[in-house]
Structures are given as structure tokens and as C-alpha cells.
Amino acid sequence: MAIDQNTLKQAVYPIVGACHEVHKHLGAFLNEYMYQDALAIELSRRNIPYEKEFAFSADYKGQRIEHQHKADFCVHGADTDILIECKAADKLIDTHRQQLWNYMRLSGIHVGVLYNFAPMYAQCEKYYYDPVTVRMIAF
């Protein structure tokens, strides 16, 4: 499946900007929940529509699984919804990426931002989930 990376970059640009603003004002080494609360404030200030603790389920052989996953945020864009996973870790690791991959795969939302607020220099990774290849593609 061909994806337009410029369209994806434009879609996540305001989200990444809000994350950078939170990191700029709060700095490094805080807990994840403080960054999440601040990001909710920043998204609201920027009039970016979102749901915090976005809950979704999965299907198993046509039946809904009772347990729900919760992504930190789902931003509702004009063209696409975008998941945001916030971290406050020394560095982003494969487990964080796998979590986002699963969330995108199960929720049907194919664009995601993984943002690590804790380091002195924040880490931001942006991904597209391709349901045909079942892979995440960085952009």
C-alpha cells in the first residue's frame, strides 16, 4: 500500500508541536502522568480534538473481546485519527514500539506517535501501520 508521507507528516505536525511544547515547559525526568496531563492541556489550548485514555477492544473470531486496551490519546483529525503513546523512560525501546504497533493494529487507527518526554532531548517517533503487510513504517 502506497502512503503519502507528506500527508502523514502534515497530520502529525501539530501533535508533535504540542508534545515539544510540553517538554520545553516541564523539562525532563518527570513521571508519565504529568506529561499526559500537560499534553491534554496543550492539545485543548491548540483546539486539537482528542480523547484521553482512548479505549478500544479487539475481535477474536468474530466476537468482541471483553478486555479493553487504552491508548494514552487519540487525536481526531479531519482526514485521519492518530494515536499518541506517551513515555517517560530513559530511552524508547522495542517494547514501546510493539505496544504502539498492537494498538494501531487492533484499534484500526493506522497512524501513531510515540513520544518519550523523560530524556533531556525528547524522543519522537512517527509511524504508519500498513494492514496489508502488518508492519509499522516510520515516517
At which residue positions do the language-model features occur?
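Interdomain/boundary linker segments immediately adjacent to catalytic/signaling cores
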Residues: 1-26
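Intrinsically disordered, low-complexity and often Lys/Arg-enriched segments
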Residues: 1-6, 133-139
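Active-site metal-binding core of divalent-cation-utilizing nuclease and nuclease-like domains
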Residues: 25-79, 120-123, 127-133, 139
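Mid-chain, well-packed structural core segment of small domains
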Residues: 63-101
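Nucleic-acid nuclease catalytic cores
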Residues: 86-135
